[in-house]
Amino acid sequence: LFSFLFLMSFSFVFSQEKQDSLRVKTNPIFFTGMNLGYVTGGLKGLHASFDINYQLKNNLVTFKYATITDLKIGILFFVPIPKINSATEQFSLLFGKRYVVDGFSYHFSGGISYNSTRDGKIDKRYNYFGFPIEIGTHWFHSKKKRFRVMYGLIPVGKPTGFGRSFGIKLHANIAKKSYVGLGLNLNLGWHKKYK
Protein backbone atom coordinates (compact mmCIF):
# COMPACT_ATOMS: atom_id res chain seq x y z
CA LEU A 1 0.00 0.00 0.00
CA PHE A 2 2.87 2.38 0.84
CA SER A 3 4.61 1.70 -2.52
CA PHE A 4 1.31 2.26 -4.37
CA LEU A 5 0.82 5.68 -2.70
CA PHE A 6 4.47 6.53 -3.37
CA LEU A 7 4.12 5.76 -7.11
CA MET A 8 0.82 7.66 -7.31
CA SER A 9 2.37 10.76 -5.76
CA PHE A 10 5.23 10.72 -8.30
CA SER A 11 2.84 10.29 -11.23
CA PHE A 12 0.74 13.16 -9.90
CA VAL A 13 3.82 15.43 -9.62
CA PHE A 14 5.06 14.56 -13.13
CA SER A 15 1.62 15.09 -14.67
CA GLN A 16 1.48 18.54 -13.04
CA GLU A 17 4.89 19.32 -14.46
CA LYS A 18 3.71 18.59 -17.99
CA GLN A 19 0.64 20.80 -17.61
CA ASP A 20 2.65 23.68 -16.19
CA SER A 21 5.20 23.59 -19.02
CA LEU A 22 2.76 24.21 -21.88
CA ARG A 23 4.36 26.28 -24.61
CA VAL A 24 3.08 29.77 -25.32
CA LYS A 25 1.63 30.00 -28.81
CA THR A 26 3.21 32.72 -30.96
CA ASN A 27 2.30 34.14 -34.33
CA PRO A 28 3.88 33.08 -37.65
CA ILE A 29 6.21 35.53 -39.39
CA PHE A 30 4.24 36.35 -42.52
CA PHE A 31 4.01 39.69 -44.34
CA THR A 32 3.32 41.21 -47.73
CA GLY A 33 5.09 44.18 -49.23
CA MET A 34 5.13 46.74 -52.01
CA ASN A 35 8.32 48.23 -53.41
CA LEU A 36 8.64 51.40 -55.50
CA GLY A 37 11.93 52.51 -56.98
CA TYR A 38 14.17 52.90 -60.00
CA VAL A 39 16.36 50.41 -61.88
CA THR A 40 19.20 50.87 -64.34
CA GLY A 41 21.34 48.60 -66.54
CA GLY A 42 20.09 46.40 -69.39
CA LEU A 43 16.63 47.48 -68.26
CA LYS A 44 15.92 50.91 -66.86
CA GLY A 45 12.91 52.75 -65.60
CA LEU A 46 10.37 52.76 -62.83
CA HIS A 47 10.18 49.57 -60.75
CA ALA A 48 7.12 48.44 -58.80
CA SER A 49 6.77 45.07 -57.08
CA PHE A 50 4.47 43.13 -54.78
CA ASP A 51 5.82 40.28 -52.64
CA ILE A 52 4.62 37.66 -50.16
CA ASN A 53 7.11 36.61 -47.46
CA TYR A 54 7.19 33.73 -44.97
CA GLN A 55 9.93 33.17 -42.40
CA LEU A 56 10.68 29.95 -40.49
CA LYS A 57 13.50 30.38 -37.94
CA ASN A 58 15.98 32.55 -39.92
CA ASN A 59 14.99 31.19 -43.35
CA LEU A 60 12.99 33.55 -45.58
CA VAL A 61 10.92 32.47 -48.60
CA THR A 62 9.64 35.19 -50.95
CA PHE A 63 7.36 35.11 -54.00
CA LYS A 64 7.58 38.38 -55.92
CA TYR A 65 5.82 39.94 -58.90
CA ALA A 66 7.58 42.98 -60.37
CA THR A 67 7.10 45.29 -63.30
CA ILE A 68 9.64 47.66 -64.86
CA THR A 69 8.42 50.41 -67.17
CA ASP A 70 10.68 52.65 -69.25
CA LEU A 71 8.74 55.79 -70.16
CA LYS A 72 9.62 58.48 -72.66
CA ILE A 73 7.82 61.80 -72.32
CA GLY A 74 6.90 63.52 -75.58
CA ILE A 75 5.24 66.92 -75.92
CA LEU A 76 2.28 67.61 -78.18
CA PHE A 77 0.93 71.17 -78.16
CA PHE A 78 2.57 71.84 -74.76
CA VAL A 79 0.95 68.72 -73.26
CA PRO A 80 3.27 65.97 -71.97
CA ILE A 81 2.42 62.59 -73.53
CA PRO A 82 4.02 59.46 -71.99
CA LYS A 83 5.14 56.69 -74.35
CA ILE A 84 6.25 53.24 -73.15
CA ASN A 85 9.66 52.31 -74.58
CA SER A 86 9.73 48.91 -72.86
CA ALA A 87 7.78 47.04 -70.21
CA THR A 88 8.97 44.00 -68.25
CA GLU A 89 7.05 41.58 -66.04
CA GLN A 90 8.98 39.40 -63.61
CA PHE A 91 7.91 36.46 -61.43
CA SER A 92 10.49 35.44 -58.81
CA LEU A 93 10.94 32.82 -56.11
CA LEU A 94 13.68 33.73 -53.62
CA PHE A 95 15.22 31.97 -50.63
CA GLY A 96 17.44 33.64 -48.07
CA LYS A 97 18.18 34.61 -44.49
CA ARG A 98 16.41 37.21 -42.36
CA TYR A 99 17.55 38.39 -38.96
CA VAL A 100 15.42 40.32 -36.46
CA VAL A 101 16.85 42.59 -33.76
CA ASP A 102 14.07 44.15 -31.65
CA GLY A 103 12.18 46.47 -34.08
CA PHE A 104 14.66 46.16 -36.96
CA SER A 105 15.36 43.40 -39.48
CA TYR A 106 17.73 42.84 -42.36
CA HIS A 107 17.70 40.15 -45.03
CA PHE A 108 19.49 38.88 -48.10
CA SER A 109 17.96 36.53 -50.67
CA GLY A 110 18.61 34.96 -54.04
CA GLY A 111 16.58 32.78 -56.36
CA ILE A 112 15.22 32.30 -59.85
CA SER A 113 12.98 34.52 -61.97
CA TYR A 114 10.99 34.33 -65.19
CA ASN A 115 11.02 37.59 -67.15
CA SER A 116 9.03 38.82 -70.12
CA THR A 117 10.14 42.09 -71.75
CA ARG A 118 8.19 43.85 -74.50
CA ASP A 119 10.39 46.24 -76.46
CA GLY A 120 8.15 49.01 -77.82
CA LYS A 121 10.80 50.38 -80.18
CA ILE A 122 10.92 47.28 -82.39
CA ASP A 123 7.68 45.62 -81.19
CA LYS A 124 9.34 42.40 -80.02
CA ARG A 125 8.91 40.29 -76.86
CA TYR A 126 11.79 38.56 -75.02
CA ASN A 127 11.19 35.73 -72.53
CA TYR A 128 14.10 34.62 -70.35
CA PHE A 129 15.14 33.32 -66.93
CA GLY A 130 17.28 35.20 -64.44
CA PHE A 131 18.81 35.10 -60.99
CA PRO A 132 17.37 37.80 -58.70
CA ILE A 133 19.30 39.02 -55.66
CA GLU A 134 18.09 41.40 -52.97
CA ILE A 135 19.32 42.95 -49.73
CA GLY A 136 16.96 44.91 -47.51
CA THR A 137 16.17 46.43 -44.15
CA HIS A 138 12.86 47.04 -42.33
CA TRP A 139 11.79 49.01 -39.28
CA PHE A 140 8.64 48.01 -37.36
CA HIS A 141 7.08 48.03 -33.86
CA SER A 142 9.07 45.91 -31.42
CA LYS A 143 6.06 45.25 -29.13
CA LYS A 144 2.40 44.46 -29.66
CA LYS A 145 0.31 47.59 -30.10
CA ARG A 146 -3.27 48.35 -30.92
CA PHE A 147 -3.79 48.68 -34.66
CA ARG A 148 -4.56 52.27 -35.64
CA VAL A 149 -6.72 53.57 -38.49
CA MET A 150 -7.27 57.07 -39.88
CA TYR A 151 -3.53 57.85 -40.17
CA GLY A 152 -2.78 56.43 -36.72
CA LEU A 153 -5.36 58.52 -34.85
CA ILE A 154 -7.92 55.89 -33.82
CA PRO A 155 -6.76 52.72 -31.97
CA VAL A 156 -8.84 49.63 -32.76
CA GLY A 157 -9.09 46.32 -30.86
CA LYS A 158 -6.61 44.58 -28.57
CA PRO A 159 -2.81 44.88 -28.84
CA THR A 160 -1.62 42.84 -31.82
CA GLY A 161 1.62 41.98 -33.58
CA PHE A 162 -0.01 42.70 -36.95
CA GLY A 163 1.31 46.00 -38.25
CA ARG A 164 3.16 48.08 -40.81
CA SER A 165 6.85 48.36 -41.58
CA PHE A 166 9.00 50.60 -43.71
CA GLY A 167 12.29 49.76 -45.37
CA ILE A 168 14.85 50.12 -48.13
CA LYS A 169 15.72 47.40 -50.63
CA LEU A 170 18.66 47.02 -53.02
CA HIS A 171 17.84 44.47 -55.72
CA ALA A 172 19.31 43.13 -58.94
CA ASN A 173 18.58 40.52 -61.59
CA ILE A 174 21.33 38.71 -63.49
CA ALA A 175 19.83 37.72 -66.84
CA LYS A 176 19.75 38.47 -70.57
CA LYS A 177 18.66 42.00 -69.60
CA SER A 178 20.31 42.54 -66.21
CA TYR A 179 19.60 45.46 -63.91
CA VAL A 180 20.27 46.86 -60.45
CA GLY A 181 17.86 49.05 -58.51
CA LEU A 182 16.98 50.71 -55.25
CA GLY A 183 13.53 51.20 -53.78
CA LEU A 184 11.38 52.03 -50.79
CA ASN A 185 9.49 49.13 -49.26
CA LEU A 186 6.15 49.22 -47.38
CA ASN A 187 4.97 46.02 -45.65
CA LEU A 188 1.94 44.80 -43.74
CA GLY A 189 1.85 41.68 -41.55
CA TRP A 190 3.61 39.96 -38.64
CA HIS A 191 7.29 40.95 -38.77
CA LYS A 192 8.59 38.99 -35.77
CA LYS A 193 7.42 36.49 -33.15
CA TYR A 194 5.45 38.52 -30.61
CA LYS A 195 4.66 37.14 -27.15
Please identify what each model-predicted range represents:
Residues 29, 43-47, 88-90, 128-130, ...:
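Membrane-spanning beta-strands of outer-membrane beta-barrel proteins
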Residues 1-26, 192-195:
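Cleavable N-terminal export/targeting peptides
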Residues 23-25, 37-41, 65-86, 117-128, ...:
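Extracellular/periplasm-exposed beta-strand and loop segments of Gram-negative cell-envelope proteins
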Residues 61-63, 69, 84-93, 101:
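Short, well-structured hydrophobic secondary-structure segments
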Residues 16-69, 187-189:
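Short glycine/proline- and aromatic-enriched beta-strand/turn motifs that initiate or cap beta-hairpins
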Residues 42-55, 91-101, 120-125:
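Generic detector of contiguous secondary-structure segments
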Residues 31-35, 76-79, 165-168:
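Extracytoplasmic loops and strand-loop junctions of Gram-negative outer membrane beta-barrel proteins
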Residues 84-86, 96-195:
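Outer-membrane beta-barrel transmembrane domain signature
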